[in-house]
Curated annotation (Swiss-Prot):
GO terms for biological process: fumarate metabolic process; malate metabolic process; tricarboxylic acid cycle. The gene is fumC. SUPFAM superfamilies: L-aspartase-like. This is Fumarate hydratase class II. It catalyses: (S)-malate = fumarate + H2O. It comes from Escherichia coli O157:H7. Pathway: Carbohydrate metabolism; tricarboxylic acid cycle; (S)-malate from fumarate: step 1/1. The record marks 331 as: Important for catalytic activity. The keyword Transmembrane does not apply. Its EC number is 4.2.1.2.
Amino acid sequence: MNTVRSEKDSMGAIDVPADKLWGAQTQRSLEHFRISTEKMPTSLIHALALTKRAAAKVNEDLGLLSEEKASAIRQAADEVLAGQHDDEFPLAIWQTGSGTQSNMNMNEVLANRASELLGGVRGMERKVHPNDDVNKSQSSNDVFPTAMHVAALLALRKQLIPQLKTLTQTLSEKSRAFADIVKIGRTHLQDATPLTLGQEISGWVAMLEHNLKHIEYSLPHVAELALGGTAVGTGLNTHPEYARRVADELAVITCAPFVTAPNKFEALATCDALVQAHGALKGLAASLMKIANDVRWLASGPRCGIGEISIPENEPGSSIMPGKVNPTQCEALTMLCCQVMGNDVAINMGGASGNFELNVFRPMVIHNFLQSVRLLADGMESFNKHCAVGIEPNRERINQLLNESLMLVTALNTHIGYDKAAEIAKKAHKEGLTLKAAALALGYLSEAEFDSWVRPEQMVGSMKAGR
């Protein structure tokens, strides 16, 4: 039995594994770009299949493709979407910057599979042509940007945003639950005036709410599709109604608000929509890193740290120190946030580096974008499930630190003035006294006045979180 078959493209014949659906151009890419291990993301492959499916339907409706061929292409695309042919898409991220080889990989797989569905022999009887039929009314230059936007928008809507909302809700519930717990605040890693634990967590909630708004603001641009621009944005070789119809078809089959890009030149020449959307993801990463750092600092200890909150103990933390448990969810979240920030630099460079009518950094851009979405979505889910939901206050420790803080002296500013209040704090710190003892020793106020004026619960403003 032959292990290879001969496939042809415009450069001639080349041997292809006999059991594979791909053709000559895919094989050439495999042989010429043996670079690292990163492959085109499955979600991007499926977005390409969705794009080809929609194009086949619209080309049929416009009388440009026979019903027989269009139906076979759609059936083949549905098989790809069902995961039946995942191993037919082996190409590296590090290929042509337009994604042409991955577009042709999809064209060849769908053409060979559609030909089989129409009774042809794999690679022998080409009843459906990869360029003339599967790629009809298209160019890699508008197909690949379209697939990028489809994959990105679906990932944001289905993966990231739900997890962001869930984590925000969890922290909002914690903020309300801890609204009456007065604790010491900290600025510059030094003691500051009091606030409630609920107020502190409300800041985290507001950060995430703003992040959601920024991400949602970026979505309409991502929903604009380049399809119909063909090679340079002019729409050469397309029907006048094709661009609008194919965007409408993609909107229907994905249940997402896709529209045809109003300016195809921008859609082909730039990656601005993804640069801007990833900027919002970078902002989310910055917020999550701050939250995770705050959580692990507040939970530090158990005996020699801050220890104001407890977090779930999920696994042993040391191979040498018995009983040690570490804030592993916080550490995982901070690491992936660093990766997202690095991805943002690469995406910015790629987005800024397109020349004239086409950006040619697209595979790298979408690889990093989808990785960031997956990291953030999975990271938030894990952090929420294994850490955030289990945050609990250590009231005894909170009260101990609150009552030992010298910064409660700030409450005296309006009664005895800043200079005398500072003198009290310095004396207490230098001599190891309580604030009350130092104040009485200096004779600046009576015991009754101190007890009336220095009341932490009255120093937090409204007890409502967010005040």
